[in-house]
Amino acid sequence: MKTAIFTVVLALAVFAVLSFGWEANGKALSEEFTELIHEKEAASETEARECRYFWGECHDHMPCCDWLVCRYKWPITYNICVWNRTFPEK
């Protein structure tokens, strides 16, 4: 009887140690993941867009990219950048 109780207590202790290790590992992974996301957001914010992309609003002071042209499209009340049927050269 004492051996069975000792085995159960020992098994519970092992499970407690293992679950604590998994929880700590999970927290570390989530912290690394959030840091990676913040780094990606910061990198994308530093890139300045010099031209407007497809369906972006355009004016004289906001030009479209090279492969797009600024046009007025009927249901929309402002000019948008549309494809000029060319491809950008790489």
From Swiss-Prot:
Keywords: Disulfide bond, Ion channel impairing toxin, Knottin, Secreted, Signal, Toxin. Disulfide bonds join C51-C65, C58-C70, C64-C81. Residues 1-26 form the signal peptide. GO terms for molecular function: ion channel inhibitor activity; toxin activity. Transmembrane segments: none annotated. The keyword Disulfide bond applies. One of its GO terms (cellular component) is extracellular region. Residues 27-50 form a propeptide. The keyword DNA damage does not apply. Expressed by the venom gland. It is found in: Secreted. Belongs to the neurotoxin 10 (Hwtx-1) family. 13 (Hntx-13) subfamily. The presence of a 'disulfide through disulfide knot' structurally defines this protein as a knottin. Ion channel inhibitor. This is U7-theraphotoxin-Hhn1a 3.
